[in-house]
Amino acid sequence: MSKSLSWDTLDYTLQPWIRTAVDAMGYETMTPVQASTIPLFARNKDVVVESVTGSGKTVAFVIPVLERVIQDDANSSKLKKGHFHTIIISPTRELASQIQGVIEAFLTYYPDGEYPIKSQLLIGSNTSSVRDDVAAFLEHRPQILVGTPGRLLDFLKMPNIKTSSCGAAILDEADKLLDMNFEKDVETILKMLPKQRRTGLFSATVSSAGTQVFKTGMRNPVKVSVKTSNKAPSSLDINYIVIEPRMKLQLLLTLLNNYRYKKCIVYLPTCIAVTYFYSILQHLAKLNKMDENLKLYSLHGKLLTNSRMKTLDRFTQELGKAVLLTTDVAARGIDIPDIDLVLQMDPPIDADIFLHRCGRAGRANRAGRAIVFLNQGREEDYIPFLQVKNVEAKELDTVAIKPIEGLPEIIRAWILEDRARFDHSLKVYVAFLRYYSKHTASSIFRLQTLDYIGIAEMHGLIRLPGTPEIQRYLSKDAIPEDGWLVSPPIDLDSFAYADPQREKARKLAKKEAKDVKDNNKLKSEMRKNNEAWSKKTVTKENKLQRKEKMALKRKAIEEKLIENSDDSDNEVETDWKDIVRQRKKKKTNSGMQGDFGDL
């Protein structure tokens, strides 16, 4: 690494227009990772770069890419139609768009009259197809492609696209690209490229990819690792707050309303949680329970691409105090300069994501703070777990919660206005349990020790759902009667949807279900009656059969006796009276036998 971080100390001369761009964009000096990476990658070295979030990794590969395009004469007409020079792969559309923005910012300083350097963004969207992308590529002939794995792979498979001129491949957030979600697509893309290309892997946690890096086809790579005792940048304070689950929303509102910040990102565990809590915060704002100067935005992975990009742009350009509720779709690489506060309602499933979340604040040596909420109990072991990964977090015990009076009642009253909100609350709760069960640190985040009632109260639930987790891990004594968390229970039959069409459909479905139930009941009764009649018939038939069998048996015995009897004419008919008299006489004679001499 160069002893000085001045741009003038690079051991080769930057293109004059790039040097002008660097000064104009406010990069007064290089960061350590830029000073180490730019000379290596610009001079035909494969690199594996690991550095803390916000350390300038994007510029560290954009400058060498632009330098290489010029060095390889790819900015001339020698680059054939259908060919390209560099491919940059990113795990998310937002990050790909941001990289494209950095490249375009540099290219605004490219001298007029030169053969233009161009880049093209390739991400899935609802407004353009792969064929549209191919048509634009063939028309504008860009040298640099920036995109997400799925769309890039579809693009490269098109017959008009040729990969033989590709001289460089960049994997930004490489550890994410090499995990099971993207691994297959990324490997396929890299196999389609020339083996002699240069490859660069960049991430704050690239070491977590392990042996996967060898699947990228690098040749004698140089590892650039900016060593620090703490993986977080020095300008970023990472804190945690231990709290009862039921008080988490009150804590969030206290920080949003009272903490000094310009822009804040709130990370929630699931997409459905983002929409749910965004609606709650909007409702509280209407009731003047939120800072009146606060603007709320929401972003998650299930939104259409255009909607996501517009939301991110509006949040970035917002001049006042603003909060973005989001999922991990905005955890990696997103660089919004004014973010100085990051709040995590729950730790992420993967500990590596924790650092990426925190790194949205404190970028480019600007002061920032990241706070994670931990449930009381076993979750407190998460802090020593982070220390093993060189992430230091300090407890923030100076925050005094300023509770909004009657908040649980406000949320429940809001839910009771519309059955759809009731359904939504149950789905959010169930989704959270699924999320919690997938934590990689399963010895810390255990369903057996979760405060199910407290979590339900934080979500504003009116009734506990009958999930397997609750049935398995919550004692029967702890489960309220029929799961109701309010008293008295509400009448679900009369609980209506605010949307007339949806309510009409519910009533129709209810009537159809009742008709089916009544019909099934009638069928059951008829079946029972039919079974009773048939059983009687069978019993009667069985008796008749037994009688017939007995009669036949008796007849057979009588016939056999007749056959065995003596029918001769000499047979003497016996008089039963004579037999009786003879027996009596015999008895008398037997009593008088003997001689007087025997006495």
Swiss-Prot record:
Sequence motif: DEAD box, positions: 172-175
SUPFAM superfamilies referenced in this protein's UniProt entry, alphabetically: P-loop containing nucleoside triphosphate hydrolases
Coiled-coil residue windows: 501-561
Documented EC number(s): 3.6.4.13
Keyword terms: ATP-binding, Coiled coil, Helicase, Hydrolase, Nucleotide-binding, Nucleus, Ribosome biogenesis, RNA-binding, rRNA processing
One of the GO BP terms on file: rRNA processing
Domain Helicase ATP-binding residue range list: 38-224
Enzyme class: hydrolase
Chain span(s) of sequence motif Q motif: 7-35
Primary localisation category: nucleus
Reactions the enzyme catalyzes: ATP + H2O = ADP + phosphate + H(+)
GO molecular function: ATP binding; ATP hydrolysis activity; RNA binding; RNA helicase activity
Pfam families membership: CTE_SPB4 (PF13959), CTT_SPB4 (PF23681), DEAD (PF00270), Helicase_C (PF00271)
Signal peptide (residue range): none
Main function: ATP-binding RNA helicase involved in the biogenesis of 60S ribosomal subunits. Binds 90S pre-ribosomal particles and dissociates from pre-60S ribosomal particles after processing of 27SB pre-rRNA. Required for the normal formation of 18S rRNA through the processing of pre-rRNAs at sites A0, A1 and A2, and the normal formation of 25S and 5.8S rRNAs through the processing of pre-rRNAs at sites C1 and C2.
Domain comment as written in the entry: The Q motif is unique to and characteristic of the DEAD box family of RNA helicases and controls ATP binding and hydrolysis.
Record text on subunit structure and interactions: Component of pre-60S ribosomal complexes.
Family: Belongs to the DEAD box helicase family. DDX55/SPB4 subfamily.
PANTHER family in alphabetical order: RNA HELICASE (PTHR24031)
The name this protein goes by in its record: ATP-dependent rRNA helicase SPB4
Protein species of origin: Eremothecium gossypii (strain ATCC 10895 / CBS 109.51 / FGSC 9923 / NRRL Y-1056) (Yeast)
